C-alpha cells in the first residue's frame, strides 16, 4: 500500500523566498532512493504552512530512508531556526482510494 508522508512547515514571513530557493536548488537525493515514487513541495495559498509530500511504495521503504546515510546528508544543512514559526509536523497516511486517471483532451 502506498504511504504518503507529509511534512508541514510554518515558514516565517520574509523567509519564503529563501525557503523556496533551497528546495529548487537541492540535489533531490531522495528521488534516487529505492521505494520513493515522487516528492512534491506545496506553497500555501493562504497562511504560512508549506507542505512537502513524499510518496513511498511502503512504510518500510520510508523507514529505510529515514535511517540511511543519504537521509542524514540530505538534511545536513537545514535553514536557520528563525526561518520557521513553529516545529514541523510530520504525518503518515496510506492511500485507501483514488480516482481513475483523468481523461486527456486531444
Where are the regions a protein language model picked out?
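Short, well-ordered beta-strand segments in beta-rich or mixed alpha/beta enzyme
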Residues: 3-9, 40-68
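Short, surface-exposed ligand-recognition loops at beta-strand->loop->(often short) alpha-helix junctions
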Residues: 10-20
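Glycine-rich beta-strand-turn "strand-cap" elements at beta-sheet edges
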Residues: 40-50, 76-106
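Short, flexible segments with low predicted structural confidence
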Residues: 1-3, 33-34
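An amphipathic, aromatic/His-enriched active-site/gating alpha helix that lines ligand/cofactor pockets
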Residues: 25-37, 55-91
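Non-catalytic surface loops within mature trypsin-like serine protease
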Residues: 11-13, 58, 94-97
Amino acid at each position: 500500500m502506498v504511504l504518503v508522508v507529509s511534512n508541514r512547515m510554518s515558514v516565517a514571513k520574509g523567509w519564503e523566498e529563501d525557503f523556496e530557493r533551497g528546495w529548487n536548488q537541492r540535489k533531490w537525493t531522495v528521488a534516487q532512493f529505492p521505494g520513493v515514487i515522487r516528492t512534491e513541495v506545496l506553497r500555501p495559498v493562504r497562511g504560512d504552512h508549506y507542505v512537502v509530500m513524499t510518496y513511498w511504495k511502503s512504510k518500510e521503504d520510508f523507514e529505510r530512508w529515514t535511517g540511511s546515510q543519504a537521509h542524514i546528508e540530505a538534511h545536513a544543512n537545514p535553514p536557520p531556526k528563525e526561518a520557521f514559526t513553529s516545529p514541523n509536523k510530520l504525518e503518515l497516511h496510506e492511500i485507501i482510494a483514488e480516482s481513475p486517471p483523468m481523461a486527456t483532451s486531444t
